[in-house]
């Protein structure tokens, strides 16, 4: 009798898993490629300022992540991170202008223009403009920080940065970016904090923020320590929902892999009105 009951429970579990997988498989995704988002900003902007939008089809009010690629502000291409796909989330992969053909403030402006595009356009594809998240890795994390912390960038497009539902900078430079310092003739180990540094714009945020870092012994020079100092300053100005994560065993390049899973948990929690447990 006990064996029969166990077999029934296993059968019910298999049926449940089959139904769950079937429901997941029924969600199709569309991708629109190379959408211009910053018209009128010049010839180089016309070349670089395009985005891809990956989103679930037939789903209403889905959340969207605006994703900025890394590359030291001098390279890289837009992408849709595999670790965020197939999760019921829209993902906008953004190209932006690069050093040295553009200066850093033009690049930050591109990031703001892309986020403004998201606020104005996601609803036409079924997305919820109240569930827009901003994220990026390395240089992309730096751009995430700048447009979330320094509100004037989005204000230029008629958007209040405080409408962003959550910010997830992955291993971002918190001081003035090293390639900006290089252009100024300043070495990689000499710190500068000017108005293009996220640390310069520390403020109390209405939305949650994750400060994400690779292993402190495997990261870029001082990168974990920058995250920790930035996190501490954000706590001191009154942020209760800013969380520091260090991914042991992962370097600067590989840390997005575990970070994506954490980010997906927070997106789900924020959308449901309850932050996940650490």
Describe the residue ranges of each PLM region.
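C-terminal catalytic histidine-bearing segment of alpha/beta-hydrolase fold enzymes
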Residues: 228, 235-278
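Short beta-strand element of the alpha/beta-hydrolase
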Residues: 61-70
């Amino acid at each position: 009798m006990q064996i029969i009951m166990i077999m029934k429970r296993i059968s019910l579990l298999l049926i449940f898993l089959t139904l769950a997988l079937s429901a997941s498989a029924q969600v199709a995704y569309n991708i629109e490629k190379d959408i211009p988002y910053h018209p009128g900003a010049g010839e180089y902007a016309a070349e670089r300022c395009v985005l891809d939008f990956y989103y679930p089809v037939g789903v209403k009010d889905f959340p969207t992540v605006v994703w900025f690629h890394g590359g030291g502000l001098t390279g890289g291409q837009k992408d849709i991170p595999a670790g965020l796909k197939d999760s019921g989330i829209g993902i906008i992969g953004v190209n932006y202008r690069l050093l040295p053909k553009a200066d850093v403030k033009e690049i930050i402006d591109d990031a703001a223009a892309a986020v403004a595009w998201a606020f104005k356009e996601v609803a036409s594809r079924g997305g919820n403009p109240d569930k827009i998240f901003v994220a990026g890795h390395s240089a992309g994390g730096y751009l995430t920080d700048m447009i979330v912390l320094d509100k004037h960038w989005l204000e230029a497009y008629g958007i209040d940065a405080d409408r962003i539902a959550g910010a997830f900078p992955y291993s971002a430079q918190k001081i003035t970016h090293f390639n900006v310092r290089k252009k100024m003739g300043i070495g990689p180990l000499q710190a500068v904090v000017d108005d293009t540094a996220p640390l310069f714009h520390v403020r109390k945020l209405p939305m949650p923020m994750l400060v994400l870092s690779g292993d402190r012994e495997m990261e870029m020079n001082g990168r974990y320590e920058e995250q920790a100092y930035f996190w501490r300053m954000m706590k001191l100005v009154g942020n209760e929902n800013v969380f520091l994560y260090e991914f042991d065993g992962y370097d600067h390049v590989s840390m997005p892999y575990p970070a994506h899973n954490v980010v997906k948990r927070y997106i789900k929690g924020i959308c449901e009105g309850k932050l996940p447990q650490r």
